[in-house]
Amino acid sequence: MLKHMFFTGGSVLALALTVLIGGGCSKSSTGPSGGTGGVVTVTGKVVGQNGQAVASVPVVVPGKPSTNTDAGGNFSIANVTTPYDISVVDAASKAALVYKGLTRTDPTLLFIGSTPGTSHTGNLSGKISGGEFTPNQPAADITRVVFASPETSGSTNTAVSGTFGAIPLNWFGPTATTGSLYALQFTADVAGLPVAAGYKGYGVRSGIAVNDGGTLTNQFDTLQTVTTSQFTGTITVPAGYALAAKLVYARVSSSAAITLFSDNTANAAFSYFTPGIPGASLLLEAEALKAGGGTAVTWKNGLAIGATGVSVNIVTPPELSLPVNAATAVDTTVTFSWTAMTGGVHLVIFQGGGSSPRYYVLTAATSATIPNMKPFGLGLPAVTVYTWAVDGFGPFGSVDAAAGPAGFITGLSIPLAASGDAFVGISASRTFTTAP
């Protein structure tokens, strides 16, 4: 299921995973009990991309016997010399992930492609009133509706009458989730951007519980008056990249954000109208693309509703160096290299077709080899075409920081993540053929 591409709530990218803003995004170079050159006991946890524990998978430190995670995803390996490499291997799903150069003793390791645990579902529908629903809203109006809880979120737009139909919800963890329903109405221009004095109403209704398999109908919310502010700034893109989109979200709680609009023009300077929701802040997402491959995304979080002169510098993604495209006779001794993404760590992706094993390497360095997983039944197949690419994640000062309690990727969407700025750079991809 994993594509070479991770992430975003935006309209330009259709990516499989999303990055966590904050939590693990620390610039510290070691973990809380990390160090260099010592002998330690590593006691960590393996989680899936949904944040749930992964049980019964082998965890390996070179030179040490492998150990399987327990039911809670926990593992412990004694007498480990720092810095160390550590791998999560699953022969059944034919995937292996290596973290390079760790010193922290309590890493959280993300098992890419895994979504363990029981998935719960539910939906809710209802009607929004107030604002410009008299009884129908004007044709130029848009009313966004969002349900959000600590475990999940979903959104839709209302019909002109204010009704909204089944917002689908999916979550892991508890069998019931309790959240709030948010609604925002505004008048938009032909491009879908809010106009001056365009915000007509905002409402929130809390304490809504959704049970697994539950369907809630007749959920309602009433809009109250909301003011309009102006939000301005400038985007700077890396050399060779073109600005593709700017998206703006209103963060209305720690677990909820309302998508305001997407501006898909290439204009670097922007001026938008935003809602004066008490206690809310703005999240700005800026996306840039490079002809021939390459994607850069930067998020500015915690911005004031009426912030002016905001400056966003999109970080330059990694660029592949060697081997050249369509290289042949590649084995686990061949070095793959790329340029660094400043302020981040690199996830190197080696992916073959069909049932071929997949390999992932998380490193702060600018080179890596394909992990030799033959002892675990995941040897590199002969004469097989593979694709490789490098994704950068930041801000992380080290792989230790990226192995913090929150990990570096979560199944939640960007607007639901913790406060803080973040960036991702996605390289172009190349192919190679393995050795006979």
Residue ranges and their predicted role:
Residues T366-M373:
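A beta-strand/beta-hairpin structural motif
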Residues M1-G23:
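Sec-dependent bacterial lipoprotein signal peptides
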Residues G10-S11, V390, L412:
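Prokaryotic Sec-type signal peptides and long signal-anchor helices
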Residues M5, G10, G44, S355, ...:
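Sparse, context-dependent recognition of short Cys/His-centered cofactor- or disulfide-binding micro-motifs
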Residues S398-P436:
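Extracellular fibronectin type III
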Residues L20-A364, F376-P405:
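Long luminal/extracellular ectodomains of secretory-pathway precursor proteins
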